[in-house]
Amino acid sequence: MDRVSHALFGWIAVLGAAISVVAILTLDAILGGESHRPGRTLRMATISEYVYTAGGWAFLTGVLALAVGSILLLAGLIRAGVVAPLSFGSILMSLWVIGLVGVAAFPKHNWEIGPSTSGSIHRVATLLAFVSLPAAVLAIARRHRQARPAVWLAYGSIAWLSVLFGAIAVSMVTDLRWHRIIPLGIVERGIVAFEVGAVIALGIWLIRGEFVTAKRLESP
Protein backbone atom coordinates (compact mmCIF):
# COMPACT_ATOMS: atom_id res chain seq x y z
CA MET A 1 0.00 0.00 0.00
CA ASP A 2 1.59 3.29 -1.08
CA ARG A 3 1.87 6.56 0.83
CA VAL A 4 -0.97 8.19 -1.15
CA SER A 5 -3.35 5.41 -0.12
CA HIS A 6 -2.24 5.76 3.49
CA ALA A 7 -3.03 9.45 3.37
CA LEU A 8 -6.44 8.90 1.77
CA PHE A 9 -7.63 6.47 4.42
CA GLY A 10 -6.16 8.64 7.16
CA TRP A 11 -7.77 11.83 5.89
CA ILE A 12 -11.18 10.15 5.65
CA ALA A 13 -10.81 9.02 9.26
CA VAL A 14 -9.81 12.51 10.40
CA LEU A 15 -12.68 14.04 8.41
CA GLY A 16 -15.23 11.66 9.94
CA ALA A 17 -13.99 12.45 13.44
CA ALA A 18 -13.94 16.19 12.69
CA ILE A 19 -17.55 16.06 11.49
CA SER A 20 -18.57 14.45 14.78
CA VAL A 21 -16.73 17.13 16.75
CA VAL A 22 -18.37 19.95 14.79
CA ALA A 23 -21.80 18.35 15.18
CA ILE A 24 -21.51 17.98 18.95
CA LEU A 25 -19.98 21.41 19.54
CA THR A 26 -22.64 23.05 17.37
CA LEU A 27 -25.44 21.30 19.24
CA ASP A 28 -23.89 22.23 22.59
CA ALA A 29 -23.48 25.85 21.49
CA ILE A 30 -27.02 26.20 20.14
CA LEU A 31 -29.00 24.02 22.53
CA GLY A 32 -26.71 24.08 25.54
CA GLY A 33 -27.69 20.59 26.62
CA GLU A 34 -31.43 21.28 26.52
CA SER A 35 -33.46 18.47 25.05
CA HIS A 36 -37.08 17.37 25.18
CA ARG A 37 -36.78 17.58 28.97
CA PRO A 38 -36.98 21.19 30.24
CA GLY A 39 -34.22 22.48 32.47
CA ARG A 40 -31.48 20.15 31.25
CA THR A 41 -27.97 21.61 31.08
CA LEU A 42 -24.61 20.46 29.76
CA ARG A 43 -23.69 19.39 33.27
CA MET A 44 -26.18 16.53 33.34
CA ALA A 45 -27.60 16.11 29.80
CA THR A 46 -26.00 13.40 27.70
CA ILE A 47 -25.09 13.95 24.07
CA SER A 48 -27.57 11.28 22.98
CA GLU A 49 -30.48 13.37 24.25
CA TYR A 50 -30.07 15.57 21.18
CA VAL A 51 -31.73 12.82 19.14
CA TYR A 52 -35.06 14.06 20.52
CA THR A 53 -34.47 17.64 19.40
CA ALA A 54 -34.63 19.45 16.08
CA GLY A 55 -30.89 18.79 15.87
CA GLY A 56 -31.34 15.03 15.97
CA TRP A 57 -30.15 14.74 12.38
CA ALA A 58 -26.88 16.47 13.29
CA PHE A 59 -26.32 14.06 16.17
CA LEU A 60 -26.90 11.04 13.94
CA THR A 61 -24.70 12.50 11.19
CA GLY A 62 -21.86 13.02 13.65
CA VAL A 63 -22.06 9.51 15.08
CA LEU A 64 -22.27 7.81 11.69
CA ALA A 65 -19.46 9.96 10.24
CA LEU A 66 -17.26 8.87 13.14
CA ALA A 67 -18.21 5.22 12.54
CA VAL A 68 -17.42 5.40 8.81
CA GLY A 69 -14.13 7.18 9.47
CA SER A 70 -13.16 4.61 12.09
CA ILE A 71 -13.83 1.57 9.90
CA LEU A 72 -11.83 3.11 7.06
CA LEU A 73 -9.05 3.91 9.52
CA LEU A 74 -8.98 0.25 10.50
CA ALA A 75 -9.00 -0.78 6.83
CA GLY A 76 -6.06 1.53 6.16
CA LEU A 77 -4.05 0.17 9.08
CA ILE A 78 -4.76 -3.40 7.98
CA ARG A 79 -3.77 -2.72 4.38
CA ALA A 80 -0.60 -1.03 5.61
CA GLY A 81 0.31 -4.16 7.55
CA VAL A 82 0.25 -2.41 10.92
CA VAL A 83 -2.77 -4.36 12.18
CA ALA A 84 -3.54 -8.00 11.44
CA PRO A 85 -7.07 -8.62 10.11
CA LEU A 86 -7.81 -10.96 13.03
CA SER A 87 -6.15 -9.42 16.06
CA PHE A 88 -7.14 -7.81 19.34
CA GLY A 89 -6.71 -4.39 17.78
CA SER A 90 -8.90 -5.07 14.76
CA ILE A 91 -11.59 -6.83 16.80
CA LEU A 92 -11.72 -4.05 19.39
CA MET A 93 -11.85 -1.35 16.71
CA SER A 94 -14.69 -3.25 15.03
CA LEU A 95 -16.55 -3.38 18.35
CA TRP A 96 -16.10 0.40 18.64
CA VAL A 97 -17.74 0.82 15.23
CA ILE A 98 -20.54 -1.62 16.11
CA GLY A 99 -21.15 0.35 19.29
CA LEU A 100 -21.37 3.63 17.37
CA VAL A 101 -23.84 2.15 14.89
CA GLY A 102 -25.90 0.85 17.80
CA VAL A 103 -25.91 4.30 19.41
CA ALA A 104 -27.27 5.79 16.18
CA ALA A 105 -29.74 3.00 15.41
CA PHE A 106 -31.30 2.70 18.86
CA PRO A 107 -32.33 5.99 20.57
CA LYS A 108 -31.73 6.31 24.29
CA HIS A 109 -34.55 6.09 26.82
CA ASN A 110 -37.13 8.83 26.42
CA TRP A 111 -37.81 9.51 30.07
CA GLU A 112 -40.89 11.55 29.19
CA ILE A 113 -42.41 8.18 28.29
CA GLY A 114 -40.34 5.70 30.24
CA PRO A 115 -37.67 3.05 29.72
CA SER A 116 -37.62 1.11 26.46
CA THR A 117 -35.86 -1.81 24.80
CA SER A 118 -34.26 0.66 22.38
CA GLY A 119 -32.90 2.66 25.30
CA SER A 120 -31.43 -0.44 26.94
CA ILE A 121 -29.70 -1.44 23.70
CA HIS A 122 -28.46 2.14 23.33
CA ARG A 123 -26.90 2.01 26.79
CA VAL A 124 -25.12 -1.28 26.06
CA ALA A 125 -23.91 0.05 22.69
CA THR A 126 -22.59 3.20 24.37
CA LEU A 127 -20.61 1.24 26.95
CA LEU A 128 -19.33 -1.11 24.25
CA ALA A 129 -18.04 1.82 22.22
CA PHE A 130 -16.57 3.66 25.21
CA VAL A 131 -14.64 0.62 26.45
CA SER A 132 -13.56 -0.78 23.08
CA LEU A 133 -11.93 2.33 21.59
CA PRO A 134 -9.19 2.98 24.20
CA ALA A 135 -8.46 -0.75 24.37
CA ALA A 136 -8.18 -0.84 20.56
CA VAL A 137 -5.82 2.13 20.50
CA LEU A 138 -3.55 0.59 23.12
CA ALA A 139 -3.54 -2.76 21.30
CA ILE A 140 -2.68 -1.10 17.99
CA ALA A 141 -0.38 1.75 18.93
CA ARG A 142 1.25 1.23 22.31
CA ARG A 143 4.47 -0.21 20.80
CA HIS A 144 4.83 2.52 18.20
CA ARG A 145 6.75 5.57 19.31
CA GLN A 146 5.23 7.80 16.62
CA ALA A 147 1.71 6.94 17.78
CA ARG A 148 2.20 8.09 21.37
CA PRO A 149 -0.35 10.96 21.12
CA ALA A 150 -3.06 8.39 20.39
CA VAL A 151 -1.90 6.29 23.34
CA TRP A 152 -1.94 9.28 25.70
CA LEU A 153 -5.45 10.18 24.56
CA ALA A 154 -6.55 6.58 25.13
CA TYR A 155 -5.26 6.76 28.70
CA GLY A 156 -7.13 10.05 29.11
CA SER A 157 -10.38 8.40 28.08
CA ILE A 158 -9.71 5.56 30.52
CA ALA A 159 -9.33 8.14 33.29
CA TRP A 160 -12.75 9.59 32.44
CA LEU A 161 -14.22 6.08 32.21
CA SER A 162 -12.93 5.34 35.71
CA VAL A 163 -15.09 8.20 36.98
CA LEU A 164 -18.14 6.73 35.26
CA PHE A 165 -17.54 3.18 36.46
CA GLY A 166 -16.67 4.45 39.92
CA ALA A 167 -20.10 6.06 40.14
CA ILE A 168 -21.74 2.84 38.98
CA ALA A 169 -19.81 0.89 41.63
CA VAL A 170 -20.89 3.31 44.36
CA SER A 171 -24.53 3.02 43.28
CA MET A 172 -24.34 -0.76 43.62
CA VAL A 173 -23.53 -0.55 47.33
CA THR A 174 -25.62 2.51 48.22
CA ASP A 175 -29.06 3.92 47.52
CA LEU A 176 -27.60 6.62 45.29
CA ARG A 177 -28.33 6.68 41.57
CA TRP A 178 -25.12 6.48 39.58
CA HIS A 179 -26.15 9.14 37.07
CA ARG A 180 -26.72 11.63 39.90
CA ILE A 181 -23.44 10.99 41.68
CA ILE A 182 -21.42 12.61 38.90
CA PRO A 183 -22.04 15.43 36.39
CA LEU A 184 -22.89 12.85 33.73
CA GLY A 185 -23.00 15.29 30.81
CA ILE A 186 -19.50 16.56 31.56
CA VAL A 187 -18.07 13.09 32.17
CA GLU A 188 -19.55 11.74 28.94
CA ARG A 189 -18.20 14.68 26.96
CA GLY A 190 -14.79 14.11 28.54
CA ILE A 191 -14.82 10.48 27.42
CA VAL A 192 -15.96 11.41 23.92
CA ALA A 193 -13.40 14.20 23.57
CA PHE A 194 -10.45 11.93 24.35
CA GLU A 195 -11.74 9.02 22.26
CA VAL A 196 -12.47 11.12 19.19
CA GLY A 197 -9.09 12.74 19.71
CA ALA A 198 -7.49 9.30 19.72
CA VAL A 199 -9.17 8.46 16.39
CA ILE A 200 -7.83 11.71 14.92
CA ALA A 201 -4.35 10.95 16.26
CA LEU A 202 -4.40 7.48 14.66
CA GLY A 203 -5.59 9.03 11.41
CA ILE A 204 -2.71 11.51 11.42
CA TRP A 205 -0.29 8.67 12.16
CA LEU A 206 -1.64 6.81 9.12
CA ILE A 207 -1.40 9.93 6.96
CA ARG A 208 2.24 10.42 7.89
CA GLY A 209 3.08 6.76 7.33
CA GLU A 210 5.41 6.82 10.33
CA PHE A 211 4.47 3.29 11.34
CA VAL A 212 7.04 2.04 8.82
CA THR A 213 9.84 3.55 10.88
CA ALA A 214 8.22 2.27 14.06
CA LYS A 215 8.15 -1.29 12.75
CA ARG A 216 11.84 -1.06 11.95
CA LEU A 217 12.58 0.16 15.44
CA GLU A 218 10.82 -2.90 16.83
CA SER A 219 12.82 -5.31 14.69
CA PRO A 220 15.41 -7.34 16.62
Predicted regions and their residues:
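Interfacial helix-start motif at the membrane-water boundary
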Residues: 46-68
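Hydrophobic alpha-helical transmembrane segments
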Residues: 60-74, 78, 130-134
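Interfacial segments of alpha-helical transmembrane regions
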Residues: 8-15, 82-95, 147-159
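Alpha-helical transmembrane segments of multi-pass membrane proteins
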Residues: 18-39
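Membrane-interface interhelical loops and short amphipathic "cap" helices
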Residues: 34-53, 110-119, 176-185
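Membrane-proximal helix-loop-helix units in multi-pass membrane proteins
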Residues: 99-145
